[in-house]
Amino acid sequence: MRSILQLRVPQIAGDEDQLRGLKIETTAASSPSVVRFRDPQIEMAHGAGGKASRRLVEGLFAPLLYPASREPLSDAAHLEVGGARIAFTTDSFVVKPLHFPGGSIGELAVNGTMNDLAVSGAKGIAMTVTFVLEEGLPTADLEAEVRAMSGALKRAGVVMAGGDTKVVERGKADGMYITTAGIGTPLPGVKVDARSVRPGDKILLSGPIGDHGITILLARGELDFEADLYSDTRSVLPLVEALAAECGPGIHWMRDPTRGGVATALNELARDSGLGIELLEEEIPMHDAVRGACELLGLDPLHIANEGQFLAVVSPEYAAIALNSLQQTAGGEEARIVGQVRVEPANAVLVITRYGGSRIVDMLVGDPLPRIC
């Protein structure tokens, strides 16, 4: 891969002294070199972002690739090299179909990568892309995705720094897969860490849940159900920047609830913080079409993927300010305070239903909606 962008980060490549001083602040938690993953083979659920994914990462990848780290899992790594700070992330996109109401794989690849940086407390500045293309893919389809990606880059103010292309035999890639990497610069005054979360903190959600996952399901024609529904794929950076400007020191944690949905993201927070999460079901914004589809299929909307929303945990004194900043920013009009952090139930998420009851909601188990991003 050839890079066409020179970054103003001192001597990251080629300087052994600087590389020895590389500090990775956010990677995966593990016990050094102890491989605990015992599943006999890889299943679709291992890529769904839920329990099986976490078991794979913590049991196999983390012990061998990050043996010295004790940091919680995060959407991006924040690196310090010679006094300069950058954020770094990587992602892959295998969504099926390639085009869907409200977006496509190319636009999703840019937005998803930049959103991982945004919720880590950074503004994306550059990315790279690798296309894995299937032999026989119509050139018009590829051009459409590159154009979609170009548009998303311009809207985000991000430079494409380089890329690579591979072609595999017919029938081996379902059209195309896209892998990205992104770098960004930290937002001033924002430091998110699950270990900073405290009992009494408030949980905010930027908008309606489930649009993306249900849109993809409908686009596949697998459900005899019609709805005027669109993927929510978009950049969340404007909302994150608005939140940071008003209450940066009060932001303790952020996450975009993609694979595995809101339930999985908040279960990860509960386990990484050792605290409990209380969600108010009646406060969670959701379109009627999403609710109806989930009821028809027996799915929990809290497990459905989103691609243009994010969760934020803020200290209670900033809650009203944070909510107002989101609701006054384009795309955040339906933001809500949806819950709070509690001491109990430790390491778990408790949903208070609209009827006054309660239930524990766990991480996603299995993969009810595969390849949604």
Q: Can you name each region flagged by the protein language model?
A:
Residues R2-C373:
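Helix-biased detector of long, well-ordered alpha-helical tracts
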